Amino acid sequence: MIRELEYYGSHILRRKADIIPEITDTIRQLVQDMYETMVAHKGVGLAAPQVGESLSLFVVCVEGETEDGDLIFCDFPKVYINPVLSNASEDLVIGREGCLSIPGLRADVYRPQSITVTALNLDGQEFTEHLEGFPARIIMHENDHLHGVLYIDKMEEPKDIKKFKASLEKIRRRYHAHVKPEDRAS
């Protein structure tokens, strides 16, 4: 089932997600729904808070990059339950990011070139991956959602931040009548 997305201004996007204590049929159905929602919106990753569930879970549908930098997409998403990131490289690289919860906007964000992620899969088995480049960026972006952080919080260019304020306000107004002050971008 394709779920409705949560958009900028939604309080759930600013909350720390809850740890998933047990992988149930409800969680399995959520993963399927998230995959269908991600595909319908042409995304490469989706975190549970983006579909209204404050749970520590995200799905990604990029397996890697070719030597030419083209993305290799998967047939079914990779599932990351209760992920923990570690070993972020000291090398920061700039990359353009967008977000299904902030439609129509993209910005340059600095992130580590590589990262290690440890998480549970849908069978409850722990796995660890070391990722580099764009796949690492996707993991960091989706993991940020589980901590109430949006990519716009990481923008460093004052001109970009200023340019985004009016656009963010339009998104907030379009999708939400009332937003708590702590959920607004600074």
Swiss-Prot record:
* BP GO annotations: co-translational protein modification; translation
The protein's required cofactor(s) are namely:
Fe(2+)
Database matches in Gene3D superfamilies: Peptide deformylase
Q: Matching CDD domains, A to Z?
A: Pep_deformylase (cd00487)
What is this enzyme's EC? 3.5.1.88
For this UniProt record, give its keywords in alphabetical order, as a comma-separated list: Hydrolase, Iron, Metal-binding, Protein biosynthesis
The record lists Fe cation as bound by: C99, H141, H145
- An example of a Pfam family matching this protein is Pep_deformylase
Asked if the record carries the keyword Metal-binding, the reply is yes
* Gene Ontology molecular function: any one: metal ion binding
Q: Any keyword Transmembrane?
A: no
Q: How is the cofactor bound?
A: Binds 1 Fe(2+) ion.
Positions annotated as active site in the UniProt record:
E142
Instruction: Output the HAMAP family linked to this UniProt entry.
Output: Pep_deformylase (MF_00163)
What the record says about family reads: Belongs to the polypeptide deformylase family.
Give the protein's recorded name: Peptide deformylase
What organism is recorded for this protein? Chlamydia felis (strain Fe/C-56) (Chlamydophila felis)
| Higher taxonomy | Bacteria, Pseudomonadati, Chlamydiota, Chlamydiia, Chlamydiales
